Design a protein with these regions (language model features):
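Structured catalytic core of nucleotide-sugar glycosyltransferases
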Residues: 3-20, 63, 67-71, 86, ...
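Residue-level detection of beta-strand scaffold positions
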Residues: 21-23, 31, 58-60, 87, ...
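A generic structural signal for alpha->beta connector loops
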Residues: 5, 83, 105-107
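Active-site metal-binding motif and surrounding structural segment of the metallo-beta-lactamase
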Residues: 42-92
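Metallo-beta-lactamase
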Residues: 90-121
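A signal for specific C-terminal beta-sheet/loop modules enriched in small/flexible residues
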Residues: 39, 51-53, 65, 111-116, ...
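Conserved beta-strand hairpin/beta-sheet module of binuclear metal-dependent hydrolase folds
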Residues: 1-52
């Protein structure tokens, strides 16, 4: 029987975007995990995950820690293209939805993208 380990990977950190992966591994095989923050483009995320032997199929949700742009920059894109649940606090969810409503009033279609991705924690 193999040992199951938990690994934390810093995929990107700094003002250019923050994104982390927390997962369970059996040796080199990922058994599932979560993505923490959405600060990098989906294209960049896929590339970084690939470099670590992972894909977007290896996480089941995205956890948002706070609403600084370097942590949420690509959240709408993740919601639209990945169809993963988004986990965050009620206060942060309200703040993100409030911003989204302002964008929607300008003709943006972000509201539906974020709304479709939310789950209660």
């Amino acid at each position: 029987m193999s040992d199951i380990n938990v690994k934390f990977l810093s995929l990107s950190s700094g003002s250019s975007g923050n994104c982390y992966f927390l997962g369970r591994f059996d040796g080199e095989n990922c058994l599932g995990g979560i993505l923490i923050d959405a600060g990098v483009s989906l294209k960049r995320l896929k590339s970084i995950l690939y470099d670590h032997g992972l894909s977007t199929d290896d996480f089941g949700a995205v956890l948002i820690t706070h609403d600084h742009m370097d942590h949420v920059r690509s959240l709408a894109s993740y919601c639209k293209k990945l169809s993963k649940p988004i986990w965050t606090s009620d206060v942060l969810a309200d703040a993100l939805l409030s911003r989204t409503l302002k964008l929607a009033s300008l003709g943006a279609t972000v509201l539906k993208l974020v709304e479709d991705g939310w789950n209660d924690v």
